[in-house]
Amino acid sequence: MTRPDLNERILSLRKLRLAQCRTRTRRTIERRNGVRLEINGSWLVEFCSNDYLGLAQHFEIIAALQDAAARNGIGATASHLICGHHAIHKALEYELAEWLGYPRALLFGSGFTANLAVQQALLTKENDICVQDRLNHASLIDATRLAGCRLRRYPHLDVDGAAHQLKNAPEGAAMLATDGIFSMDGDIAPLRALSLVARTQQALMYVDDAHGIGVTGPQGRGCIAAAWLSVEEVPLQLVTLSKALGGYGAAVLGSATLIQHLAETARPYIYTTALPPAQAAAALTAIRIARRDEWRRQRLQELVERFRENSRRHGLEIMDSETPIQPLQCGDETTTMAMSAALEREGFLVNAIRPPTVPEGKSRLRVTLSALHTTEQIDTLVQALARSRDALATEAAPVKV
């Protein structure tokens, strides 16, 4: 018997990624000051983080984390069901449920883990089905595959497509899952229409609102609140503590029955050490600031509008997004990487997003905005984007003889 050599396979795949301009590297951040990062001794203005409200370095949140670490240590020491569920976890779950208008919340270490937990615990039969938007986050897609149920995907934002998939699978339990705000496109799911489809087809509606929480809706309560949907219309949702709230972790919110079922049966919850109490304390403080500081959302929206207006004025090919995620279409991987490198030379960090994260031929620069950015930084970035685009176009133009 001759098995495939895994090392040879890895080397072959690496060569392919190099040829396709799809290798990935990590950048080491030496220091951070708001939206400014020091990398290799140089300071760059970043337009690529998810710190939408500018809370990651907020002094009140840092103080809450330090105080909780001094009292409780740096780790929970066990899973929630053993002896890792601290009073601060309980307080955070209560605050989340009260803020978002759900009966209960359940904490997880990350949004990826939470999505795995939800589908593994609820979609337990082979003929169960999860219907998803084609551009959903990878964790939602992987969760369905790992759960062992059927996965059906509909064209992006296509409500009729979602209904069609559910109608064609009448047997088995069903879930309709979607991102609230799509992380690579920045657009918002048609939640009201999708929730109606879910109820009509007797499917459980599940919304991953990782990028909506804190950013949109009344008091920053996210996409579901912005669409004026109730718990009955969206029985289950996920929020993260790591984007607009600036920390780490996630939570799933739903009815007491659903949440208790997850706590008792979801393997990624049962067999994982609880979120560090200090992180929970930081998240609790971040939520209170996010609820209090409406000016952060107002400021963020003003910057989004300014970026879009300036980009249109310079003829930049921005996508249709009214959120802090503002992708700029570049087409092929080589062009996208070249534009990212050109921006870095001008003092900006904007990541190139390439397949398989986005579809073939749709590589882009994913510009993300923070309430901490200044109007000058926005304007200067747009000018740099236009210059890099024009420079690349000049290089690609045929030479006249």
From Swiss-Prot:
Substrate binds at residues 24, 137, 357. Its EC number is 2.3.1.47. Transmembrane segments: none annotated. GO terms for molecular function: 8-amino-7-oxononanoate synthase activity; pyridoxal phosphate binding. GO terms for biological process: biotin biosynthetic process. It comes from the Bacteria. InterPro entries: Aminotrans_II_pyridoxalP_BS (IPR001917), Aminotransferase_I/II_large (IPR004839), AON_synthase_class-II (IPR050087), AONS_Archaea/Proteobacteria (IPR004723), AONS_Proteobacteria (IPR022834), PyrdxlP-dep_Trfase (IPR015424), PyrdxlP-dep_Trfase_major (IPR015421), PyrdxlP-dep_Trfase_small (IPR015422). Gene3D superfamilies: Aspartate Aminotransferase, domain 1, Type I PLP-dependent aspartate aminotransferase-like (Major domain). Keywords: Biotin biosynthesis, Pyridoxal phosphate, Transferase. Pfam families: Aminotran_1_2. It catalyses: 6-carboxyhexanoyl-[ACP] + L-alanine + H(+) = (8S)-8-amino-7-oxononanoate + holo-[ACP] + CO2. Pyridoxal 5'-phosphate binds at residues 111-112, 183, 211, 240. Belongs to the class-II pyridoxal-phosphate-dependent aminotransferase family. BioF subfamily. HAMAP family: BioF_aminotrans_2. Catalyzes the decarboxylative condensation of pimeloyl-[acyl-carrier protein] and L-alanine to produce 8-amino-7-oxononanoate (AON), [acyl-carrier protein], and carbon dioxide. This is 8-amino-7-oxononanoate synthase. It comes from Xylella fastidiosa (strain Temecula1 / ATCC 700964).
